[in-house]
Amino acid sequence: NEQINLEVSCKNQDGNFWKSSAIFQTNDKGVVYVAKQAPISGSYKGIDSMGLFWSMTPTDKDSSKNTFLSQITLHLHEVSLSVFLGNKLRIQKTIRRLFVPPDVEKKDIHEQGIVGTLFYPKNTKKSFGIIIIPGSGGKVPDVVSQLIASHGYTVLALTYFKADGLPEKLSLIPLEYFQQAMRWLKKQPQVDGNKIALMGHSRGAELALLLAATFPREMNAVIAYSASNLVYSDFLLEQKSAWTYNNT
């Protein structure tokens, strides 16, 4: 039985180094089970298989460098795991972590009045279909959709304004457009038509909840974060409704 120091380190997309460490007690066979053991001391407490990853902090204490991801990108992420016995490095392994595997397909959609981008994994069985509804910015970052698709989902990043054939502003957007998008997604060969979810944040979350209340039979789940229990107007001085249904 010996004490070892396990360190995890990486360089973020801005080139700044981050690191964590923890001391563990090995068993009679010299093995440490990070998922089953709490560290004796270190950058986190308790049993947590990912503790060394989330507890990393920047080695440079400059406050301008304390954000791990300054922007969402598909940047390849390499993490080094090192085992020290005393002050001696015994073994080191570098893991390459991909945000998105190469088997995720991307297809621009502009048909049946629907505008957006479809993401889906190659060569999979029919999957859960997810429509991601952006907020007031009007755009879903590709990396978010691709990341979800990499877990086996078919994702439609839906555009509903600021595009050809669509309203210029987030004002008087017909809810029927989203109903049409759900019905379109159900018919795609990659999708199990009985498994449709809406996902949105901010104004997109407001809209997802409104659509669930208006068209409950069109979907099976709603993921709404940074949502509101109120339905707000548009952002224009006229204070019109952001959404319409049956032309009202």
List each model region and its residues.
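Alpha/beta-hydrolase fold nucleophile elbow
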Residues: 190-202
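Alpha/beta-hydrolase active-site loop
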Residues: 169-189, 210
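Short beta-strand element of the alpha/beta-hydrolase
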Residues: 126-135
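N-terminal cap/lid segment of alpha/beta-hydrolase-fold proteins
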Residues: 17-18, 26, 76-125
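Hydrolase active-site cap/lid region
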Residues: 209-248
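Ser/Thr-rich low-complexity repeats and stalk/linker segments
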Residues: 7-63
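Glycine-rich nucleophile elbow surrounding the catalytic serine of serine-hydrolase chemistry
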Residues: 200-210
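Short amphipathic alpha-helix adjacent to the substrate-entry channel of hydrolases
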Residues: 141-158
